[in-house]
Amino acid sequence: MPSFDVVSKTDLAEVDNALAGITREVAQRFDFKGSKCSVERKDQMITVLADDDSKLKTMHELLSVHFTRRKVDPKALDYKTVEKASGNTVRQEVRIKDGVETVLAKRLVKEIKDAKLKVQVAIQGDELRVTGKKRDDLQEAIALLRKLDVDQPLQYINFRD
């Protein structure tokens, strides 16, 4: 029986490459001269440190640009609240989303069921398994999922006939 998996994975090596590019750009840009702006990653968290809110906003733009350049979807970033750090600096934690969360998984299952496609959907941990009798039904399911406005990048893997 044909099937495929819906996952949300982020390539951490590409994230590291993007962060290295941001660090290089911050070191060379004129508007960051003498500032204490930095980005660093620890596991699934990125810490952004900036002098003030305007520099933090610029760092967000740099994150978006460099992630897109490295073919990492910026939707994979979950920005936490901005907090004061030592001195006059501000810090923000950014979580890298990995895996399809249960709330999103239930929403995707509901959307597929509402479309009345001839497929079965099963939630397996942090991924979805979609099975059907015909390959065409699975391709319709992929097209439906791509049309949905999801706040997280989705990949479709293990397409088996």
From Swiss-Prot:
Keywords: Nucleotide-binding. GO terms for molecular function: nucleotide binding. GO terms for cellular component: cytosol. InterPro entries: DUF520, UPF0234-like_C, UPF0234_N, YajQ-like_sf. The keyword Nucleus does not apply. SUPFAM superfamilies: YajQ-like. Gene3D superfamilies: 3.30.70.860, YajQ-like, domain 2 (3.30.70.990). CDD domains: YajQ_like. The keyword Nucleotide-binding applies. It comes from the Bacteria. Nucleotide-binding protein. Belongs to the YajQ family. HAMAP family: YajQ. This is Nucleotide-binding protein amb3630. It comes from Paramagnetospirillum magneticum (strain ATCC 700264 / AMB-1) (Magnetospirillum magneticum).
